[in-house]
Design a protein with these regions (language model features):
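PLD/PLD-like phosphodiesterase catalytic module centered on the HKD motif
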Residues: 78-182
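PLD-like (HKD) phosphodiesterase/transphosphatidyltransferase domain
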Residues: 2-91
Length: 182
């Protein structure tokens, strides 16, 4: 003969039912994340290197970038000269907007060797400190001062950032030409 469920058994059965329903709702919400951009954070100098290494996988063969050369080279000594050459070997062309600083001018002078086209903008007005690279369906941000790397993977966001870059490029080219006039 089966025994009657005890009050504690009923309580535990009820709790299991409630928790299983909550778990099912949480699992459903996780499934919906697929429609959202994937965002990855990387900390420290290693994290910054990680996001730059990811840019070397650009399938489109193109990167557009806004960056401060001074901050890049100060944050990670001896990394970028080799990175530039690996990007070139991988056939990934870069168009970049640099602040008009001594290092920006130096890097612009190395455009051909580093498989890049760059323009300079007045650093007092348009100087930035992080690097922002856009490639494929990714937006990469490297904050050298905060020691943080971020990759946002979203076709929609990357497309918008590429269009914003194109608009900035037109203005930056005009500023670059103006600074080179006698």
């Amino acid at each position: 003969m089966a025994s009657k469920p005890t009050p504690s058994h009923k309580i535990w059965t009820r709790r299991v039912h409630i928790y299983s329903n909550e778990l099912a709702l949480q699992l459903k919400s996780i499934q919906k994340v697929g429609d959202r951009p994937q965002v990855r954070f990387y900390e420290g100098v290693g994290g910054i290197k990680t996001v730059f290494e990811d840019s070397l996988s650009a399938q489109s063969g193109n990167i557009v970038a806004y960056t401060s050369i001074e901050d890049q080279h100060k944050a990670i000594h001896n990394y970028f000269p080799e990175y530039y050459q690996r990007r070139k070997r991988n056939g990934i062309f870069m168009r970049a907007i640099f602040p008009n600083t001594p290092m920006g001018i130096e890097r612009q002078g190395a455009n051909l060797n580093e498989f890049r086209n760059s323009v300079l903008v007045p650093s007092e007005t348009y100087g930035i400190h992080p690097a922002i690279n856009v490639y494929d369906n990714k937006l990469m941000i490297a904050s050298f001062r905060e020691k943080l790397g971020i990759i946002i993977e979203s076709a929609e966001i990357a497309d918008a950032m590429k269009k914003i870059f194109e608009l900035a490029w037109v203005g930056a080219e005009a500023l670059d030409k103006k600074t080179k006039m006698p």
